[in-house]
A protein has these predicted regions:
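N-terminal signal peptide c-region/cleavage motif recognized by signal peptidases
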Residues: 14-16
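Positively charged n-region of N-terminal signal peptides that target proteins for export
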Residues: 1-4
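PEST-like low-complexity, intrinsically disordered acidic/proline/serine-rich tracts
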Residues: 26-139
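N-terminal phosphate-binding loop and flanking beta/alpha elements of the actin-like ATPase fold
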Residues: 7
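Boundary at the C-terminal end of the N-terminal hydrophobic targeting segment
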Residues: 19-23
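Short, linear, compositionally biased motifs with a strong N-terminal bias
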Residues: 10-11, 30
Length: 139
């Protein structure tokens, strides 16, 4: 019985540490690398455990960079007032503020989205998640 309890405890701890690593902001994103990216939405993926937005960003030379942004899960976006088919749609030009991936790829954890008309919606966790950094840029 003691051996079974010990093995169960080890398996539980192994699973817990893997879950915590998956949900660690600083494991994937750099709290010191804030980004503000403007582009055109190409796709909105409402999927658990995290929603994703994809943008085409036109560089000064005319080439296109593709960016992926992670956000709240769908149920949290809906509770924050998002509408699945109208809040963010392909073709919209937006500016997304967030934190860049540690590996330097065109991946970021989004915090807020600003639309062409100036209104802003929250797409990610509140202040402090970026390793205690300022969550929203000041205008």
């Amino acid at each position: 019985m003691k051996r079974a309890s010990f093995l169960f405890g080890c398996l539980f701890l192994a699973h817990t540490s893997a879950s915590l690593a998956h949900h660690s902001f600083l494991a994937e994103y750099d709290g010191d690398k804030q980004v503000t990216i403007t582009g055109v939405v190409t796709e909105v993926d409402w999927r658990n455990p995290h929603s994703h937005f994809y943008l085409d960003v036109t560089k000064p030379d005319g080439t296109i960079d593709k960016w992926k942004f992670e956000a709240f899960p769908p149920n949290m976006l809906l509770r924050n007032g998002w509408k699945r088919d109208t809040t963010l749609k392909p073709g919209m030009k937006v500016t997304i503020f967030g934190w860049r991936a540690r590996d330097g790829s065109n991946l970021a954890h989004s915090r807020q989205i600003t639309f062409e008309d100036g209104h802003v919606i929250v797409s990610g966790p509140p202040a402090g998640t970026g390793g205690g950094r300022t969550a929203v840029p000041t205008p």
